Amino acid sequence: QIGVWKALREAGMKIKGVAGTSVGALNGALICMDDLGKAEEIWGNMTYSTVFNVDDSMIGKLKKFGVRSMKVTDAAAEFRRLFSDRGLDIAPLKKLLEETVDEERIRRSPRDFCAASFSVTDRKEEDFDVKAAPPGTMKDIMMASAYFPGFKQEKLGGKTYLDGGSVNNVPVDLLTDRGYKDIIVIRLYGIGVDRRRFMDIPEDVTVHEIAPRRNLGGILEFDSARTRKNMKLGYFDGLRFLYGLCGRKYYLDMPYSEAYYFGRIMSELDMFKEWLRPYVKEHEFAKLTGYRVYTEKIFPFLARKLRLQPEWDYRDLYGAVLEVFAKKMQMEVYEVYTPDDIVGKIHELFSDRLTIG
């Protein structure tokens, strides 16, 4: 979410309102405060002990080697400590919210800010207009929205709450109910209910979705290496959304028509022959002449091998082949490439092979 926000912010996109649940509520507060630096600092240095009262070194051993890496007595003592008093001690998370959430900055923000939670006391979803909250209660709202099962239960404002994602992990309705017409949803694919499946989005409302194509890790995986990687992924997924970048794994700047890329394919057939080499016997290569054999046989074959959608076009095919070569050449994923960038690398590779030969 923070990575996407960075991309939107750099592009000058005006954000008028934010709705979040669970971790999205904390990120929503940072967006309302317009404090990208603080957001990157928090997530870039995130550890388990930032959220729970735990020993990071012990968690590291558990992740790397499993429970067997610990003495039985040490493991038993740690689990008793973690889950004593009916749940995980989240005092560090409360401290983080206390140090981060600036109520006055949020109230002065021109952006609307809503959060969702589930009231166990009332047995129903409870939505909050955060900026209208009584003084001193914003941090409690953040906690109420993020009260994950397993956390030590404490009453907030006389009520017991559960993570809002359990009933509404994509709170689009909080914005449509306030008249918003152009909405960007940043998906994390956490547990819970996507309420959009059960709501009728008004016809005059446009919902754009930015969703990761890679695993973001576990829902309670608070590891700085993981969160930095996820921020980078979010940033480039934001660029994909903003500028219509192509690619499944890579980020390709391919803004021209299908006809343009068909022309490039036909002028770069040697590159396609190289891709085909594992699938075509050497003596068959001599028969790969003329355009019809490519358009009628070779290209459909490639599309199947690359698992393109049935409605693929030559822009899709060209981009998919470029991605195969980019992966083979171990090119950095988190960069924006033009076809010329990748084709240039391919030519360098072929040239080196010829020189060596």
Model-derived regions, located:
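Patatin-like phospholipase
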Residues: 1-21, 29-357
